[in-house]
Amino acid sequence: MRVLGIETSCDETGVAIYDDAAGLLANQLYSQVKLHADYGGVVPELASRDHVRKTVPLIQAALQEAGLQAQDIDAVAYTAGPGLVGALLVGATIGRSLAFAWDVPAIAVHHMEGHLLAPMLEDNPPEFPFVALLVSGGHTQLISVTGIGSYTLMGESIDDAAGEAFDKTAKLLGLDYPGGPMLSKMAQQGVEKRFVFPRPMTDRPGLDFSFSGLKTFAANTIRDNDDSSQTHADIARAFEDAVVDTLAIKCRRALDQSGFKRLVIAGGVSANRTLRAKLAEMMQKRGGEVFYARPEFCTDNGAMIAYAGMVRLKGGTHAELSVTVRPRWPLAELPAI
């Protein structure tokens, strides 16, 4: 069975084809980073228009990469939310229309479930149950996962997501959009503990996060010190260390609370090398395992949507004839299969 996956939730157009026997057959991705760079962030209207231009050519490229024709596709999966409503509608409309034209099932996929299941694309996929840390520009959540669709929210950010805090702090440091990865690169040149940032909400029980205060702390630190490149690198190091430590502390608590031995990290920030190293060290000491996708599957992509669509289709899920998207869509509302 082959599923075509379409991802258009924000500023990346992704199309992939997944075969339940042969694995990933094609993976095409177009990033809109250059389009939005001049504006310092994603402009929803521009994102939607670019998805209109790029989605169909990427579908054609994916079919060519896989050596397939339209009649070889058994289902079409598309991201139905959460995300930017206009961007979601582009992928959903194209995906639902293709499914209707090809007379195959359509599957509306939850974007964050796609991220959560992305490590399943690797050679050593995690087994259930596990704790999942979903960490991206729009979400920071700890989820107890006991099966597909069996998701219990353990904690989440009460304000900025971790990725959003990275991007905002990077902007304060004068870095271009998207600043998160650039901040991490700058942090590698920073002196450890020259500056020490707080670890928000780690001095109280619970698994919720708060990162907006770190941005304010960074702004004050930048204001009160010289603007040399070394000082900026030291501030970047202090900021990244604070975020990574906070995430690790909360993950440890979630594992203690659940009793699980496996940890999955997913979402764009899961590509951060410092975070990966910190959690790998923590899990080794605990005698557990940590799982994550390769970097290209951490950010938005069609492969995770195709895979999640395959899993949902096998579980009996398919979309209605109408096109419906959900810009806000709690993960816990998904049915278990």
Curated annotation (Swiss-Prot):
Binds 1 Fe(2+) ion per subunit. It is found in: Cytoplasm. Keywords: Acyltransferase, Cytoplasm, Iron, Metal-binding, Transferase, tRNA processing. It catalyses: L-threonylcarbamoyladenylate + adenosine(37) in tRNA = N(6)-L-threonylcarbamoyladenosine(37) in tRNA + AMP + H(+). Its EC number is 2.3.1.234. Its cofactor is Fe(2+). Its main location: cytoplasm. It is an enzyme of class 2 (transferase). Fe cation binds at H111, H115, D300. GO terms for molecular function: iron ion binding; N(6)-L-threonylcarbamoyladenine synthase activity. It comes from the Bacteria. Substrate binds at L134, V135, S136, G137, G138, D167, G180, N272. GO terms for cellular component: cytoplasm. GO terms for biological process: tRNA threonylcarbamoyladenosine modification. Required for the formation of a threonylcarbamoyl group on adenosine at position 37 (t(6)A37) in tRNAs that read codons beginning with adenine. Is involved in the transfer of the threonylcarbamoyl moiety of threonylcarbamoyl-AMP (TC-AMP) to the N6 group of A37, together with TsaE and TsaB. TsaD likely plays a direct catalytic role in this reaction. HAMAP family: TsaD. Belongs to the KAE1 / TsaD family. This is tRNA N6-adenosine threonylcarbamoyltransferase. It comes from Erwinia tasmaniensis (strain DSM 17950 / CFBP 7177 / CIP 109463 / NCPPB 4357 / Et1/99).
